[in-house]
Amino acid sequence: MRHRHGLRKLNRTSSHRLAMLRNMSNSLFQHELIKTTVPKAKELRKVVEPLITLAKKDTVANRRLAFARLRDRDMVTKLFTELGPRYATRPGGYTRILKFGFRQGDNAPMALVELVDRPEITEAPAEEAAE
């Protein structure tokens, strides 16, 4: 019986799935907004939310746990210096999944995954550079 097995395999081997989710987590922490398929987005949420909760308390042990999951020193630093303090008062729900239509080639349902309360990027610097 398949009771209580709450993991989507995403048609990948376990090492491929782990590497893919690690790369997607790093991309989400770096850009704070990524585009992916809906099933991958839902699995990514299960990885990212506990990491942000871990980053609320900046200890050496927590940094080591986050590094074991992310394997990227710069993203661990950003996680603990920017994202942890940003969500210190929020009790969970750090990500938002927005449906984004269907992919052209295979009609896969797409989604935007973003960190809530992310700073808005203004278009003014791009206009100044054009002038």
Swiss-Prot record:
Keyword Transferase tagged: no
Record PROSITE patterns: RIBOSOMAL_L17
GO MF term set: structural constituent of ribosome
SUPFAM superfamilies: Prokaryotic ribosomal protein L17 (SSF64263)
InterPro entries: Ribosomal_bL17, Ribosomal_bL17_CS, Ribosomal_bL17_sf
Listed GO biological process terms: translation
Subunit: Part of the 50S ribosomal subunit. Contacts protein L32.
UniProt similarity note: Belongs to the bacterial ribosomal protein bL17 family.
Protein name (Swiss-Prot/TrEMBL): Large ribosomal subunit protein bL17
Lineage of source species: Bacteria, Pseudomonadati, Pseudomonadota, Betaproteobacteria, Burkholderiales
